Amino acid sequence: MSNSNQPLLSKPKSLKHKNLCLVLSFVAILGSVAFFTAQLISVNTNNNDDSLLTTSQICHGAHDQDSCQALLSEFTTLSLSKLNRLDLLHVFLKNSVWRLESTMTMVSEARIRSNGVRDKAGFADCEEMMDVSKDRMMSSMEELRGGNYNLESYSNVHTWLSSVLTNYMTCLESISDVSVNSKQIVKPQLEDLVSRARVALAIFVSVLPARDDLKMIISNRFPSWLTALDRKLLESSPKTLKVTANVVVAKDGTGKFKTVNEAVAAAPENSNTRYVIYVKKGVYKETIDIGKKKKNLMLVGDGKDATIITGSLNVIDGSTTFRSATVAANGDGFMAQDIWFQNTAGPAKHQAVALRVSADQTVINRCRIDAYQDTLYTHTLRQFYRDSYITGTVDFIFGNSAVVFQNCDIVARNPGAGQKNMLTAQGREDQNQNTAISIQKCKITASSDLAPVKGSVKTFLGRPWKLYSRTVIMQSFIDNHIDPAGWFPWDGEFALSTLYYGEYANTGPGADTSKRVNWKGFKVIKDSKEAEQFTVAKLIQGGLWLKPTGVTFQEWL
């Protein structure tokens, strides 16, 4: 760690450089406001669409209505009382991209000039988060271009804009422990980006057609966004899948590569077709970061107890939570089957992630994911887990994706001294995000080391990591290691009235809801239509992308 009194720019000319940056930024902001206001005037004078709302109407559902209206006022003039919402969103996103690029430069300079491993790691996280956020905003503008919108388009944009806000918040979390001088230069710009991401979501939600806000389409066994080929792959016999793999990884030299990292590096970038890496039985001590350009990559092993990818990065030893993952997937369309993802850092090392997924339309099938605190980081976007075995202690399924778990074993372990087990810590930051954790037809049990001492160790279904945390447990078996209260607060009254925690049609000795918490945000779901909002079909639009993968899934209840 660098000294907290160490200035970011240590040379005498640094103050001039800093002041010059601030002046240039101010001038550029003024210029951008004028430019984008002019663009908006042009758009509105040529468009008499009936999708017009005042700024107060657009901001009605915003996290902070005053902030929303203040930011939108940059794009209005006294002669304009109404705005075309889609045009406004497009212009607003263009402006946000410009501001993001400016902030990226500042963050990059802060990383270069910072001292200490933790500082550099935090800023590196931010650079990555802003880079992918730019991509998501550009994709959103392209998706809505031309006026040919459908439910898939709306679902895509809602998911992508939700991820942008989460990325910015992840960035702020990663730099929370960096030196004060380094942080104070970039934090105001990052907080401005957060505000703009919230406004973009508010504008978009005001555009949404009348429909369920968690519209998802999944049928049969997998989400519908899986292609026919992907579905065939997941339904293929292990032998067939291994024979047809593009490359083989084997520690004994019988494959093309000896490490998974080598195989990932050799995989094509931005591939439109599935690229399969077969990883033979063995223990692979590697930290693997699958970049955003490694799209449609699939890792296949010899079984969730045979092919093991293991690491031990953790927060106590200097990593950020984001960077501690043994395997991190950032390329859209990521799939994994018959693999064991492991982080062996142990409970004393605090946050230590086994698998982090920041990739859209991800499928994890028949895998094992083992660690203690923060085992599985379902960071952003749409994810589906089937027939997998997940273990941990504190907040061991966490993040802010739209994620469904089906037919999984969710197993609490014996934690460190004085710790309580929390199965989930969902991180929804804004009421307009379409994110949630849905656990359907799973088994929630205690591990062999926890079962004998479960009377002395408190285990809960989850706690609210963020203000609008949203988690549903439905049609699952809940064993008696779960505390009768069911859920646990994060910090006092925080989020207890704004969260959404639901339980529906569960079984087992721990499923009794008579002694559950009486928070405003908790409810025992009685109506199947309400529960359906958290199915594969509605939460992750599974019907659009899971079918082609071949993975088994249940579309509805």
Curated annotation (Swiss-Prot):
Catalytic EC class: hydrolase
Pfam families: Pectinesterase, PMEI
Stretches for region Pectinesterase inhibitor 18: 47-203
Entry's Gene Ontology BP terms: cell wall modification; defense response to fungus; killing of cells of another organism; negative regulation of translation; pectin catabolic process; response to bacterium
Domain of life: Eukaryota
Coarse class of the protein's main subcellular location: secreted
Key words of the record: Antimicrobial, Aspartyl esterase, Cell wall, Cell wall biogenesis/degradation, Fungicide, Hydrolase, Plant defense, Protein synthesis inhibitor, Secreted, Signal, Toxin
Compartments where located: Secreted, Cell wall
Cysteine pairs bridged by disulfides in the record: none
Alphabetized CDD domains for the sequence: PMEI-like_4
Site feature (Transition state stabilizer) residues: 373
An example Gene Ontology CC term for this record: extracellular region
UniProt pathway annotation: Glycan metabolism; pectin degradation; 2-dehydro-3-deoxy-D-gluconate from pectin: step 1/5
Signal peptide (UniProt feature, chain positions): 1-34
Entry binding sites for substrate: 321, 351, 463, 465
Catalysed transformations (reactions): [(1->4)-alpha-D-galacturonosyl methyl ester](n) + n H2O = [(1->4)-alpha-D-galacturonosyl](n) + n methanol + n H(+); Endohydrolysis of the N-glycosidic bond at one specific adenosine on the 28S rRNA
Function of the protein: Acts in the modification of cell walls via demethylesterification of cell wall pectin. Inhibits the elongation phase of protein synthesis.
Extra information: The PMEI region may act as an autoinhibitory domain and prevent untimely PME activity during transport.
UniProt family annotation: In the N-terminal section; belongs to the PMEI family.
Protein's UniProt name: Pectinesterase/pectinesterase inhibitor 18
Originating organism: Arabidopsis thaliana
